[in-house]
Amino acid sequence: MTDSSSASDPTAGPVDPGPAPSAPDPALEDPASTPANGHHPNQADSFNMEQQMKIGEPEDNAGLLESSMRLKPHEAQSYRKKALWVSWVSIVVTMILAIAAFTVSIMRHSASAFGFAFDATLDVLSSIIVLWRYSNAAAVHSAHREYIACVILGVVFILSAITILVKAIHDLATKLEPEVDDFLYSVSVISGVVCTVLCVCKFMLGKVLTSRALITDGFNSLVGGVMGFSILISAEVFKHEPSVWFLDGTIGILIGLIILAYGVKLLKDMVPRIRQTRHYERFE
């Protein structure tokens, strides 16, 4: 009677629903979601994790080239070996061409042949630098090593350009006329064809590996190919028009200026980058 009367009494106060249910503990619902150390991640931990992920990315100036994002490890090593093979072939072939061109320049008084001989010597040196650049398998993507190689190439370019310019200007000042024969033609054609083929191979590998050093080596081979054909052109022109004796020396000056400009630009671009990546020598 008491319960029914109290339930029907409109003046009675509200019934107490009891204590409110507490929010479930995530750790009790899913034990796997709790870290092993019992510590839940907070904002500081999330920030540290993001920072670590950024540090691990190859494009944050951490001393890696763009090729580290494009190539898989086995692909990078495959292209590295190809670059080494091309460099060895370039060293052997251009050394033979340099000796032949020096012989032609001495025997036939050709300024452009001398320029090509020096450029072939430069090609040998640049290929040796590329060999050093890719000698370490772990440093295939090392930007710091890449920039050092480019700076050395820039210095060699400038020194070679000065020598070529001095020789060409001297020949023009003394009105030295080149002598034309079959030996000169043979060296010119072989040099032009071989250097052009090497240039294409180096440019392709340099593009894949994003290597400025390989591209620079390819540019040097391109200059060698142009100079090889220029020897042929200037000799043929002089054979039919002796009054155009200055063409040979003029081409030598032009090539010297091109090499000089490229060397200066290389130093201007790469010296600041060496300073930026000097703390990232972990692959050396």
Swiss-Prot record:
Keyword terms of this UniProt record: Cell membrane, Cytoplasmic vesicle, Endosome, Lysosome, Membrane, Synapse, Transmembrane, Transmembrane helix, Transport, Zinc
Membrane association type: Multi-pass membrane protein
Region Disordered, residue ranges: 1-44
Residue ranges annotated as Extracellular topological domain: 105-111, 167-182, 234-243
Location(s) in or outside the cell: Cytoplasmic vesicle, Secretory vesicle, Synaptic vesicle membrane; Early endosome membrane; Late endosome membrane; Lysosome membrane
Main subcellular localisation: membrane
Gene Ontology cellular-component annotations: early endosome membrane; late endosome membrane; lysosomal membrane; plasma membrane; synaptic vesicle membrane
Stretches in topological domain Cytoplasmic: 1-83, 133-145, 204-212, 265-284
Catalytic reaction(s) noted: Zn(2+)(in) = Zn(2+)(out)
Biological process annotations from GO: myelination; oligodendrocyte development
Protein origin, superkingdom: Eukaryota
Keyword field contains Cell cycle: no
GO molecular function, one term: monoatomic cation transmembrane transporter activity
Cysteine disulfide links: none
Its biological purpose: Zinc ion transporter that mediates zinc efflux and plays a crucial role in intracellular zinc homeostasis. Binds the divalent cations Zn(2+), Ni(2+), and to a minor extent Cu(2+). Is a functional modulator of P2X purinoceptors, including P2RX1, P2RX3, P2RX4 and P2RX7. Plays a role in central nervous system development and is required for myelination, and survival and proliferation of oligodendrocytes.
Family in the record: Belongs to the TMEM163 family.
Listed name of the protein: Transmembrane protein 163b
Organism from which the protein derives: Danio rerio (Zebrafish)
